[in-house]
């Protein structure tokens, strides 16, 4: 039961206003080195569908009442932290030359000093439509079943600096998960039993596996 509650707190994407204990990093290197800038308040709100269409499908908009800080958060900050929650600024990210656009996406610390971003599909080879997911991993999967958003999201690895402007986000697809599960034959077979490639890329499938492997946890 405790494990289900932990999973729910990790993966449910909510709408709230952040007050206190909020900080941000200006770069990936700052994140790796744990160099955070503390601020008083930031507002985190779910973006409307129309806003996503015109400026990128990222789920969140983070703002500050102070104009100078608001500009930093919108254009310069790399990642924002509020309590145990992380949000990565998609303005700095791309995949296959396609920009993610404005706004923030939910993220989790991955394997210590990397980030696992939960977002829509992006890239030259990705369609805009989302695949549903019918397969779950027992009790672990049950903890995230209520969160339908995860069915329509995929996971990306953010693990290195860029050429100075944009960072490349790596899709956690079947090849990626094959490497992750290379030494875990049983879990690999269970993962491959999920019907359809798009479903195997769903965050609802990927996240419970990463948790079980100890690659993600609460920040």
What is each of the regions a protein language model found here?
Residues 1-25:
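Bacterial Sec-dependent N-terminal signal peptides
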Residues 9-17, 30, 35, 46, ...:
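Generic low-complexity, intrinsically disordered sequence content enriched
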Residues 13, 33, 51, 205-206, ...:
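Intrinsically disordered regions, especially transient/low-confidence alpha-helical propensity segments
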Residues 180-219:
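C-terminal partner/receptor-binding element of secreted or periplasmic proteins
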Residues 23-187:
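Aromatic-patch recognition
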């Amino acid at each position: 039961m405790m494990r289900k509650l932990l999973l729910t707190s990790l993966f449910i994407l909510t709408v709230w206003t952040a007050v206190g204990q909020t900080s941000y990093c200006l770069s990936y290197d700052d994140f790796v080195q744990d160099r955070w800038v503390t601020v008083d308040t930031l507002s985190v709100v779910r973006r409307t569908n129309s806003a996503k269409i015109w400026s990128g499908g990222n789920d969140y908009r983070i703002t500050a009442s102070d104009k100078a800080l608001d500009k930093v958060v919108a254009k310069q900050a790399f990642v924002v932290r509020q309590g145990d929650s992380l949000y990565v600024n998609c303005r700095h990210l791309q995949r296959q030359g396609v920009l993610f656009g404005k706004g923030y996406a939910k993220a989790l610390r991955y394997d210590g000093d990397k980030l696992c971003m939960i977002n829509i599909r992006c890239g030259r080879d990705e369609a805009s439509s989302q695949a549903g997911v019918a397969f779950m991993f027992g009790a672990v999967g049950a903890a995230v079943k209520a969160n339908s958003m995860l069915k329509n999201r995929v996971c990306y690895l953010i693990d290195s600096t860029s050429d100075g402007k944009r960072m490349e986000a790596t899709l956690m697809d079947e090849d990626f998960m094959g490497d992750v599960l290379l030494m875990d034959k049983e879990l690999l077979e269970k993962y491959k039993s999920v019907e359809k490639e798009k479903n195997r890329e769903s965050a609802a499938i990927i996240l419970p596996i990463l948790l079980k492997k100890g690659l993600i946890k609460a920040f």
